[in-house]
Amino acid sequence: MFLFGCSKEDVVTPKKEFTLSIDSVLTQSGMRSLPKDKNGFYHLKLDETKNQTIHRITGRILLNGKQPTPSEKVEWESNLFWHLKRNDTIATITKSYINYFTGQYTIVKLPPMIASKDELVPTINGSSYSGTNGEFNTMIAPIYTMKGDTMIVKASNYTSKLFDIKKIVLE
């Protein structure tokens, strides 16, 4: 006994078309993009009063023109790193409170956080996930001694095999 089956319709697998782009490197306020030159390089003025200059990068990943569900992981890379040496001060911490006995506003300087070992510190957060309308964000934090360097930022997505690269001149 033999059994055979036929169908008029082939099973159609939906086509997955991804798009991925880094849309902008935002100003400190986050309200607009940093200026770009004719070569498409962003220009970031480093804050000489602080060790790190923190800025947000935003982009978008879409699946067939729509927000991907579930969210897609975006991995970030940068060509720049800096060294945190053992016994360097990582942060100074202050605590502020109202003294309940005197009623005075009091600020207390706590002991600083000290690095316990040498570390290589990236200038960009390593990953983020897409959200509403496929938007994703990350933070960069180049340090002032990188002035004159060009930061190369890469965003990539494993599922789609797509990536985008932007260059930021540190001034």
Predicted regions and their residues:
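The feature marks long extracellular or luminal low-complexity segments
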Residues: 6-171
